[in-house]
Protein backbone atom coordinates (compact mmCIF):
# COMPACT_ATOMS: atom_id res chain seq x y z
CA UNK A 1 0.00 0.00 0.00
CA UNK A 2 2.79 2.40 0.99
CA UNK A 3 4.62 1.61 -2.26
CA UNK A 4 1.54 2.50 -4.31
CA UNK A 5 1.17 5.82 -2.47
CA UNK A 6 4.80 6.61 -3.30
CA UNK A 7 4.13 5.73 -6.95
CA UNK A 8 1.09 8.00 -7.00
CA UNK A 9 3.08 10.86 -5.46
CA UNK A 10 5.92 10.38 -7.98
CA UNK A 11 3.41 10.34 -10.84
CA UNK A 12 1.85 13.58 -9.58
CA UNK A 13 5.28 15.14 -9.23
CA UNK A 14 6.16 14.25 -12.79
CA UNK A 15 2.94 15.83 -14.00
CA UNK A 16 3.75 18.98 -12.02
CA UNK A 17 7.22 18.99 -13.57
CA UNK A 18 5.79 18.61 -17.03
CA UNK A 19 3.42 21.48 -16.36
CA UNK A 20 6.41 23.74 -15.76
CA UNK A 21 8.33 22.19 -18.65
CA UNK A 22 5.39 22.63 -21.00
CA UNK A 23 5.07 26.32 -20.11
CA UNK A 24 8.72 26.89 -21.10
CA UNK A 25 8.47 24.78 -24.24
CA UNK A 26 5.18 26.43 -25.21
CA UNK A 27 6.89 29.82 -25.27
CA UNK A 28 9.52 28.43 -27.62
CA UNK A 29 6.83 26.76 -29.73
CA UNK A 30 4.92 30.01 -30.23
CA UNK A 31 8.11 31.71 -31.38
CA UNK A 32 8.84 28.99 -33.91
CA UNK A 33 5.16 28.43 -34.86
CA UNK A 34 5.52 24.66 -35.00
CA UNK A 35 4.74 21.66 -32.84
CA UNK A 36 7.62 20.96 -30.48
CA UNK A 37 8.95 17.44 -29.97
CA UNK A 38 9.61 15.98 -26.52
CA UNK A 39 11.17 12.55 -26.01
CA UNK A 40 9.90 10.54 -23.04
CA UNK A 41 12.20 7.68 -22.09
CA UNK A 42 10.61 5.07 -19.82
CA UNK A 43 13.69 3.57 -18.20
CA UNK A 44 14.49 -0.16 -18.33
CA UNK A 45 12.11 -2.65 -20.01
CA UNK A 46 12.17 -6.13 -21.48
CA UNK A 47 14.69 -8.34 -19.67
CA UNK A 48 15.88 -5.38 -17.54
CA UNK A 49 13.41 -4.87 -14.67
CA UNK A 50 15.36 -2.09 -12.95
CA UNK A 51 14.83 -2.13 -9.19
CA UNK A 52 12.39 -4.68 -7.77
CA UNK A 53 10.42 -3.65 -4.69
CA UNK A 54 9.76 -5.78 -1.62
CA UNK A 55 6.30 -6.55 -3.00
CA UNK A 56 7.72 -7.57 -6.40
CA UNK A 57 6.82 -4.34 -8.16
CA UNK A 58 9.27 -3.72 -11.01
CA UNK A 59 10.72 -0.30 -11.76
CA UNK A 60 10.26 -0.86 -15.51
CA UNK A 61 6.48 -1.17 -15.00
CA UNK A 62 6.24 1.97 -12.84
CA UNK A 63 8.37 3.92 -15.33
CA UNK A 64 6.16 2.83 -18.23
CA UNK A 65 2.92 3.69 -16.42
CA UNK A 66 4.22 7.16 -15.53
CA UNK A 67 5.65 7.69 -19.02
CA UNK A 68 2.35 6.91 -20.72
CA UNK A 69 0.55 9.39 -18.43
CA UNK A 70 3.19 12.02 -19.18
CA UNK A 71 2.77 11.38 -22.92
CA UNK A 72 -0.98 11.87 -22.66
CA UNK A 73 -0.60 15.10 -20.66
CA UNK A 74 1.94 16.53 -23.12
CA UNK A 75 -0.15 15.63 -26.16
CA UNK A 76 -3.08 17.48 -24.59
CA UNK A 77 -0.77 20.52 -24.50
CA UNK A 78 -0.20 20.01 -28.26
CA UNK A 79 3.33 18.63 -28.09
CA UNK A 80 4.54 15.87 -30.35
CA UNK A 81 5.77 13.09 -28.05
CA UNK A 82 8.25 10.42 -29.09
CA UNK A 83 8.48 7.50 -26.68
CA UNK A 84 11.52 5.24 -26.37
CA UNK A 85 9.05 2.45 -25.56
CA UNK A 86 5.28 2.10 -25.11
CA UNK A 87 5.24 -1.56 -24.08
CA UNK A 88 7.44 -3.82 -21.97
CA UNK A 89 10.32 -4.17 -24.41
CA UNK A 90 14.02 -3.46 -24.32
CA UNK A 91 15.75 -1.55 -27.10
CA UNK A 92 18.20 -4.31 -27.91
CA UNK A 93 18.53 -7.20 -30.34
CA UNK A 94 17.85 -10.60 -28.76
CA UNK A 95 21.21 -11.90 -30.00
CA UNK A 96 23.18 -8.93 -28.62
CA UNK A 97 26.22 -9.80 -26.48
CA UNK A 98 25.58 -6.81 -24.21
CA UNK A 99 21.89 -5.94 -24.17
CA UNK A 100 22.26 -3.16 -21.59
CA UNK A 101 24.88 -1.30 -23.64
CA UNK A 102 22.92 -1.70 -26.87
CA UNK A 103 19.73 -0.55 -25.13
CA UNK A 104 21.44 2.64 -23.91
CA UNK A 105 23.02 3.27 -27.32
CA UNK A 106 19.65 3.00 -29.06
CA UNK A 107 18.04 5.42 -26.59
CA UNK A 108 20.83 7.94 -27.20
CA UNK A 109 20.60 7.47 -30.99
CA UNK A 110 16.83 8.06 -30.91
CA UNK A 111 17.26 11.31 -28.98
CA UNK A 112 20.03 12.49 -31.31
CA UNK A 113 17.96 11.63 -34.37
CA UNK A 114 14.74 13.30 -33.18
CA UNK A 115 16.50 16.44 -31.83
CA UNK A 116 13.77 17.24 -29.28
CA UNK A 117 13.42 20.50 -27.37
CA UNK A 118 13.43 18.31 -24.26
CA UNK A 119 14.23 14.70 -23.40
CA UNK A 120 13.06 13.21 -20.10
CA UNK A 121 14.16 9.84 -18.75
CA UNK A 122 11.91 8.39 -16.06
CA UNK A 123 13.42 6.24 -13.30
CA UNK A 124 12.71 5.31 -9.70
CA UNK A 125 15.89 5.34 -7.64
CA UNK A 126 16.44 3.42 -4.44
CA UNK A 127 19.04 4.13 -1.80
CA UNK A 128 20.59 1.93 0.88
CA UNK A 129 20.20 4.76 3.42
CA UNK A 130 16.51 4.68 4.37
CA UNK A 131 16.82 8.28 5.63
CA UNK A 132 17.36 9.52 2.07
CA UNK A 133 14.04 10.51 0.58
CA UNK A 134 12.62 12.78 -2.07
CA UNK A 135 13.03 13.31 -5.78
CA UNK A 136 16.20 14.15 -7.65
CA UNK A 137 16.36 15.83 -11.04
CA UNK A 138 19.27 15.10 -13.37
CA UNK A 139 20.37 17.21 -16.32
CA UNK A 140 23.04 17.19 -19.00
CA UNK A 141 25.97 18.88 -17.27
CA UNK A 142 26.99 20.92 -20.33
CA UNK A 143 23.53 22.47 -20.74
CA UNK A 144 23.12 25.81 -18.97
CA UNK A 145 19.39 25.89 -19.79
CA UNK A 146 19.03 22.27 -18.70
CA UNK A 147 20.67 23.08 -15.38
CA UNK A 148 18.43 26.11 -14.83
CA UNK A 149 15.30 24.10 -15.64
CA UNK A 150 16.41 21.16 -13.48
CA UNK A 151 17.02 23.45 -10.50
CA UNK A 152 13.55 24.99 -10.86
CA UNK A 153 11.90 21.57 -11.10
CA UNK A 154 13.95 20.26 -8.14
CA UNK A 155 12.95 23.24 -6.00
CA UNK A 156 9.26 22.94 -6.92
CA UNK A 157 9.17 19.22 -6.16
CA UNK A 158 11.01 19.64 -2.85
CA UNK A 159 8.62 22.43 -1.83
CA UNK A 160 5.55 20.47 -2.90
CA UNK A 161 6.65 17.37 -0.97
CA UNK A 162 8.02 19.37 1.98
CA UNK A 163 11.23 17.33 1.89
CA UNK A 164 13.23 17.64 5.11
CA UNK A 165 16.60 16.77 3.58
CA UNK A 166 16.13 17.94 -0.01
CA UNK A 167 18.37 16.73 -2.78
CA UNK A 168 20.00 19.04 -5.28
CA UNK A 169 19.65 18.82 -9.05
CA UNK A 170 22.60 16.87 -10.44
CA UNK A 171 24.49 17.18 -13.72
How would you label these PLM feature ranges?
Residues 2-9, 19-33, 64-171:
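Active-site-proximal helix/loop segments of hydrolytic enzymes
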Residues 12-16:
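Bacterial N-terminal signal peptides
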Residues 36-56:
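Short glycine-rich His-centered loop
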Amino acid sequence: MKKHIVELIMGCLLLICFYYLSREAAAVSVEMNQKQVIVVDCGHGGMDPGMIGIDGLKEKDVNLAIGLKVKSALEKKDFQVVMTRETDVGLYDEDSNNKKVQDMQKRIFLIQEVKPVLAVSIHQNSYEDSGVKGPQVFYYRDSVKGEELAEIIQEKMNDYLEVERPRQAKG
